[in-house]
Amino acid sequence: MKKLITLIAGLLLVALPVGLAGCDDSDKEIYNDGRLVTDVVIPTSMTVYRGMEVSVSGYGFAQGDAIALRAGEDLPAATTVASEKLLTFVIPDGAADQTVYKVVLNRAQDYQVLGSSKMTVQLAIDVDLGKTISGNWGGDAVIRGRGFMATDKLLLEQGGGKFEAPVKGADDSSLTFTIPQNAADGDCEFTLQRGAEEQALGSAKLNLSLGGVTVPDKEGATIKGIVHLAGQGIADVLVSDGDLITKTDANGFYWLNSEKRNELAFVILPAGYDVPTVKAMPQFWQPCTLDANTVEQLDFQLLRADNDSHTMLVATDMHLANRNTPKDYVQFADGFVKELTSAYNSAAPGKVYCLNLGDFSWDHYWYDTKWALPECKQSVEDFNFQMWSVMGNHDNDPYVASDFGAEGPYRQHMGPVYYAMNIGRIHYIMLDNTEYLNTGGSQGTVGSRNYNRRFDDRQLAWLKEELTHVDKSTPIVVGCHCPLYSYSGSGGVSVALQTQADIDKILSCFAGFSNVTFLTGHTHVNRNIQSPTYANVYEQNIAAVCGTWWWTQQYGNNNVCTDGSPAGYKIFTVDGTDLKWQYKATGLPIEKQFITYDMNEVKEYWATDATALKAFAAGNDMRNRDKDYSTVGENAVYINVWAYEPGWTVTVTENGTPLDVKQVWSKKDPLHSISYDIPRGAANNGTLTFPSTSCMHMFEVTASSASSTLEISVTDRFGNVSTESMTRPKALTTDVTK
């Protein structure tokens, strides 16, 4: 029998007394001008579960009395009378949550309203998870509470993924469940499910043990551990300290003769597996906590994953620093984070990942605005998918004038600065190609934050060793912050690292691999460049999430990069070894891949707009900007195709007649100019921090008149088509949707 709850007046803080007279139950509480029972108090609110027995004390109860809950219609409740002083009824299955019920006593033809109560109806009540639930994978654990049923389902949620924990049984005071194999150490949300109903039970920390597994010491090893699936060791998994790479034995054990230089160790995720996730951060690394001469055990849990097909969201240059108007973190939350959580948080675990290509933070403001890597991590906690990261030049400690030392906070909060993982059948390698010099930096003093764009020799040695474990036919995706290449002039390619020798050092590591894609950021523009000297290497330099460092919202009510690309990210769709990609402008439909400019209107704006004329007159960085489009002919139209790359086609027709389309290599984008350069120049004496850059994906056509309508179609290398019917004249506006 379920435990009884006795509702006695002396224990109630707030109650409604039974009325004294009346013949209807709308305001008066006694039928037939007399009381059936007395001294009854019904609480104004109750938290109950269906099937729960509720006892009411009073005087005058009789065998045959019945209780109904009245909210419009009567809902009969099974009733028993223990004595003339105690009646018990059962909360019926039809009781509705957050409903005010009148508790009606029925006796033959008479009835009496005993009182009214707002009922909070739950699946279970008095649930106590405790702060920590300890146990082993496959072992039993208990949740205290009342109202559980053996047929209930228990759902656990960790890192955005929900999975079932089998219910073993239930009694009057608890529910017993089996800890599933895909549970992980750390915070966990618990949800009770019964049919179509769910109830959040709360959260607790899972403290899961390996059941006494101890990895034996080995001579010379300072780091040891086990790589396991639910406590069972996994053989042939690579583990590294950033200098050495080793492989687990048949028991899943590993040993590293480590100097602990990086003060951490990490697992190189094997295909078919995943790692647990905590607040969007993949748990693939562990910090060392003991000195270099002391042996410590660092264990790694893996989870099964069906991720041969997955989506990889590639984003870069968030530059979160608690500055700008509106604040950068507000723009980030309202734009990028909101869009990704809405679109991808409901995806199954192992189906969506994110790559962050660096400049998550902004070193210059770490100490001034109290916003550094920990705050940046908090800004993405709502992601129900993993965000894997590399560091950018702005993710270094600006008080430290050495590359390795300045990386310390990153290793502490984000993990290794270079590593690798297999997600599905793609081998991802995350590298660090900023050598942070930071001349003049010291504790309390921000240095010059200067850096070199190169891969250091230790990292290259590690990379060469890591690649010996990868089949040459495997597609390779390399993420790093700084680009390898840039454009020079009309389609020419130049080296963006320090020297050609730096290019050769990194790209020669991939000799024999046929499909190597580098994903980079740093520039805040879109560029796609085939390596001119390494046929197997293709680079995609991706525009920034922050656009122009979060400035254009203030001036243009938009978020635009210096080449006119709307701030955004790239979506990679992976099916086995096949990769496809599209640029996604934040806040715009993915079908929109370009913007058009009626250059007649642009030139008119340059010649007549008061703010533009003020900015041009200010000189400094705005000197000669009045001549931006002085050589552009009449009836010209510009088309900025944001993510254009080899294999795309741009076609334009006027009244059914095709127009000649030519690529323009040296012009600035009008949208960025009116969203930042002109208003900022006018307000700041012509001085610009982030001026428009030459756009390398601009196209031009010349129409036959100023008022014709143009039909424009852009087709990418995968057959995706974007179109616009451009009605002219078309006004120049900061609205990126136009």
Language-model features: locations:
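Short, acidic Ser/Thr/Gly-rich low-complexity loop/linker segments typical of extracellular
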Residues: 80, 168-171, 243-258
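Extended active-site neighborhood of metal-dependent phosphoesterases/phosphodiesterases
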Residues: 271, 275-277, 283-287, 365-470, ...
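Short, ordered, surface-exposed loop/turn motifs in non-cytosolic proteins
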Residues: 151, 221-243
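N-terminal active-site segment of His-dependent metallophosphoesterases
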Residues: 214-222, 229, 273-367, 738
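Binuclear metal-dependent phosphoesterase catalytic core
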Residues: 537-643, 648-650, 696-703, 709-724
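C-terminal motif of bacterial Sec signal peptides marking the signal peptidase cleavage site
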Residues: 18-22
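Aromatic sugar-binding surface patches on proteins
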Residues: 81-90, 170-177, 669-700
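Beta-strand/beta-sandwich contexts
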Residues: 24-63, 110-150, 199-214
